[in-house]
């Protein structure tokens, strides 16, 4: 029952403060106990699975830490990436102001060799498009470095907590960070996207009937998330590179595009190439190359480094400046 006003007035502020402090102390004590139980169970699991010793050390103010040997951490997160073949070679040389510049030709230039860029390149290559992937560093992007532990997927309708594309799209844009049309397109495309990764060999967990194991994640009422563990994103990059190698993809590593070139045809601006710096280029003092193309896919990463608080590796830079200089409009940056 609610307290009456005269009852509240009889409570001493000092007594109330002491009661709150006591309650807070009890809650914190119970929380620490729960954390210790979880950590001890983690240690037992690690000892049993990897036959190594993980120690529980106590810090100040009951902040406990698990001291896990680096060998265990490496085994949990390390992924052996494939050896890249098909390094692109220049077709010809042109002279510009007395400087010899190598020329590379392709139909579509993909900037970035992370999960997004490689997936775009693989799908284009499968459809017979002449693709060239240019990357500042192979296996150095956010996908290959962060190793995120879960990916969201669409699940077919079931009797229990069924799912559909509309509700999935609403969940994607429920935080107000993206528009519904983009969310709906991603929801519809996620079926083929996940199926493609499985076809390439992504080792997602399955139950005894062959269904992918799922769990609920943020803004997820149907249980759409699945995971390969702490190496999920790295494994995605691995299988995509393996597929790219199988398809004979041309890749240009150590390459940074600095300008997108475009011209106007019948009043419509179109891309015709890009100027890039190639660290391995020794035929001119600037390391400058020209890539001739008719389409460009910019997959150099999002604006994570623009924010003070970010979970992305600090050395992973995006290429939004290229898009802005080329006159493109940016949207859904906070997706």
Q: Which ranges hold each PLM region?
A:
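Conserved N-terminal/central alpha/beta ligand/cofactor-binding core
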Residues: 38-42, 46-90, 95-103, 129, ...
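Phosphate-coordination loops involved in phosphoryl transfer and adenosine-cofactor binding
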Residues: 105-107, 254, 293
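N-terminal Rossmann-like FAD-binding beta1-loop-alpha1 element of flavoenzymes
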Residues: 108-132
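Short hydrophobic core segments
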Residues: 109-111, 291-300
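Low-acidity, Ser/Thr- and Arg-rich intrinsically disordered low-complexity segments
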Residues: 4-19, 25, 31-34, 41
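Glycine-rich loop(s) and the adjacent beta-strand/alpha-helix scaffold that form part
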Residues: 295-335
């Amino acid at each position: 029952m609610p307290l009456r006003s005269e009852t509240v007035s009889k409570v001493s502020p000092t007594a109330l403060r002491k009661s709150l402090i006591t309650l807070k102390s009890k809650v914190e004590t119970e929380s620490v106990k729960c954390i210790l139980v979880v950590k001890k169970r983690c240690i037992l699991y690690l000892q049993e699975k990897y036959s190594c010793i993980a120690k529980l050390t106590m810090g100040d103010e009951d902040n406990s830490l698990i001291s896990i040997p680096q060998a265990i951490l490496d085994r949990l997160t390390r992924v052996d990436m494939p050896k890249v073949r098909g390094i692109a070679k220049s077709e010809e040389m042109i002279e510009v102001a007395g400087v010899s510049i190598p020329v590379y030709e392709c139909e579509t230039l993909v900037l970035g060799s992370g999960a997004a860029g490689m997936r775009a390149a693989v799908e284009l290559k499968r459809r017979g498009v002449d693709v060239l992937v240019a990357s500042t560093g192979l296996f150095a992007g956010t996908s290959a470095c962060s190793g995120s532990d879960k990916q969201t997927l669409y699940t077919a309708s079931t009797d229990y907590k069924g799912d559909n594309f509309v509700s999935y799209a609403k969940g994607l844009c429920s935080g107000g960070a993206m528009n519904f049309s983009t969310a709906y397109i991603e929801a519809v495309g996620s079926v083929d996207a996940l199926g493609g990764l499985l076809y390439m060999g992504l080792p997602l967990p399955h139950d005894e009937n062959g269904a992918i194991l799922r769990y609920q994640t943020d803004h997820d009422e149907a249980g759409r998330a699945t995971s390969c563990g702490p190496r999920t994103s790295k494994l995605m990059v691995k299988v995509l590179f393996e597929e790219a190698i199988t398809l004979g993809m041309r890749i240009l590593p150590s390459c940074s595009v600095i300008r997108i070139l475009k011209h106007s045809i019948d009043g419509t601006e179109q891309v015709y190439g890009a100027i890039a710096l190639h660290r391995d280029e020794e035929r001119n003092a600037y390391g400058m190359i020209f890539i001739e193309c008719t389409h460009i896919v910019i997959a150099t990463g999002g604006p994570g480094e623009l924010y003070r608080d970010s979970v992305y590796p600090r050395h992973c830079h995006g290429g939004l400046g290229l898009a802005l200089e080329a006159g493109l409009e940016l949207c859904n940056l906070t997706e």
